[in-house]
Design a protein with these regions (language model features):
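Internal helix-loop-helix
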Residues: 84-176, 227-228, 357, 361
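A short, Trp-centered hydrophobic/proline-enriched beta-strand micro-motif
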Residues: 180-190
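A glycine-rich, basic-preceded beta-loop-alpha segment at the flavin cofactor/substrate interface
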Residues: 255-257, 264, 276-307, 324-341
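A glycine-biased, small/acidic residue-tolerant capping/turn segment at secondary-structure junctions
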Residues: 399-424
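Extended, charge-enriched "interface" segments that sit outside catalytic cores
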Residues: 1-116, 135
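A short core secondary-structure module
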Residues: 214-260
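Extended amphipathic alpha-helical segments enriched in small hydrophobics
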Residues: 308-374
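C-terminal helix-coil-helix/basic helical segment that borders enzyme active sites and/or dimer interfaces
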Residues: 358-393, 399, 406-409
Length: 424
């Protein structure tokens, strides 16, 4: 039987000149600047591990995990069906899978558990690759990683908590930490009236018995912006008679009862939606003082410094992924008789994007080398101002960098089912 003519023109056109998806590639092997930086900063021994990690990060299935984690936002319920207060945030399985991979590969732990030469550089490079898949879930990974220097200021608490914090496993269940082999740590500092001016905090800490470092307190007040509220414990700032102090507050009490740390709402954020951020109230939440009473900012600043380091590394990762997406598009798209990446003006734009991306990554890994060499006075002095400086500039630049990358891709880059809108 002969084929009937298409009288109704059901097939109107052939799809041509559309780039294929950037997937099933190796993020490490295609990043020559990263390879050079890893060698230069002293982590050449991690090449094979980073190559394997780069392969995982570039697979279509891995990239889809990031998409699914953001497409399916976290949900919150205050009570279970029997009326018990649960304060439970539920995440899509894709979020949990990304968390599992991160923690099983030691993104929160390796420089602390195996402080060999180049450990911070190798971990930063791995975090850089991981963040390009999906950035939001990296928040609790970073906070867990960054909590260690602050906890070490209170040795008895560190001895109790660090084995589970540093375990290379992930347990997302809403259970007391005593029933889990691994835990994650969050941070709760800001309040409504002060924001980053944490010395204006009004949350109060009342001693249960004796007062001072390592002692138990009950916290009463609120925190206005708490990300990853399902972490198993939080480093919290609260006022005592001696001033602002730092506390470790678990979500569950030692007797297995729920600590009265009550989530009020999830923030309806712009972007970064896979990472739940919340407002909470503390109604006598049990916590233990970390560090010297009245020196809470000085105590928690060790954690803040390491979160700043990860924030600039993650921001550099976002810039790298924006560059990769723009470059891939321009290599496979033609206009006015030539590939976009052959057009002189486009070549200038792509070169500018590459220079800024590589500069951000280079800075981050140089700081990682300083963190690896704290016995050297020059490196120790460098490691103090470098994270906040990098956190300011590198974290400030990605939106503008992403806008320029999206301008290379134009309209198709703005679709929410793609990775690119998450980079803005």
């Amino acid at each position: 039987m002969s084929k009937s003519p298409d009288h109704y023109h059901a097939s109107t056109h052939d799809v041509v000149n559309q780039p294929v998806a950037l997937e099933n590639y190796n993020l490490f092997e295609q990043d020559l600047a990263l390879q050079a930086a890893v060698e230069r900063e002293g982590a050449g021994q991690a090449r094979d591990d980073l190559r394997h990690y780069g392969h995982w990060a570039g697979q279509a299935e891995t990239i889809d995990l990031g998409h699914q984690a953001n497409l399916n936002k976290p949900t919150f319920r205050t009570h279970d069906r029997f009326g018990h207060r649960v304060d439970e945030v539920s995440f899509h399985p894709a979020y949990h899978e990304l968390m599992r991979v991160a923690l099983e590969h030691g993104l929160h732990s390796t420089p602390w558990t195996d402080p060999a030469p180049g450990a911070q550089v190798a971990r930063a490079a791995r975090f850089y690759l991981h963040s390009q898949v999906e950035a939001a879930h990296c928040c609790p990974v970073t906070m867990t990683f960054a909590a260690i220097p602050t906890l070490q200021r209170q040795p008895e608490l560190a001895k109790l908590w660090m084995p589970k914090i540093l375990a290379n496993s992930y347990d997302p269940r809403n259970l007391p930490d005593t029933e889990k082999n691994s835990v994650t740590i969050g941070m709760a500092m800001t309040e409504k009236q002060g924001g980053s001016d944490v010395r204006a905090n009004t949350t109060r800490a009342y001693p249960v018995g004796q007062h001072g470092p390592g002692q138990a307190y009950e916290l009463v007040g609120h925190k206005w912006f708490v990300s990853a509220p399902m972490c198993d414990a939080f480093l919290v700032l609260a006022q005592t008679d001696a001033g602002l102090s730092c506390f470790l507050m678990p979500r569950w009490r030692p007797d297995g009862s729920k600590n009265p740390w009550q989530i009020q709402q999830l923030k309806n954020k712009m972007g970064n939606v896979a990472n739940a951020s919340s407002a909470v109230e503390l109604r006598g939440a049990l916590a233990w003082m970390v560090g010297e009473e009245g020196r809470g900012v000085r105590t928690i600043i060790d954690m803040v410094a390491m979160t700043r380091f990860d924030c600039m590394t993650g921001s550099a990762a976002g810039m790298r992924q924006a560059l990769a997406q723009a470059n891939h598009h321009c290599r496979h798209r033609s206009a006015f008789g030539a590939r976009l990446n052959e057009q002189p003006l486009m070549q200038n734009v792509l070169a500018d994007l590459a220079i800024e991306s590589e500069a951000a990554m280079t800075y981050a890994l140089r700081v990682a080398r300083a963190l690896d060499n704290q016995s050297n006075e020059h490196e120790r002095l460098l490691a103090r101002p470098a994270p906040p400086v990098g956190n300011y500039w590198i974290c400030y630049r990605p939106p503008t960098h992403a806008y320029e990358a999206l301008d290379c891709i134009r309209c198709s880059g703005l679709m929410s089912y793609l990775l690119t809108p998450r980079l803005v």
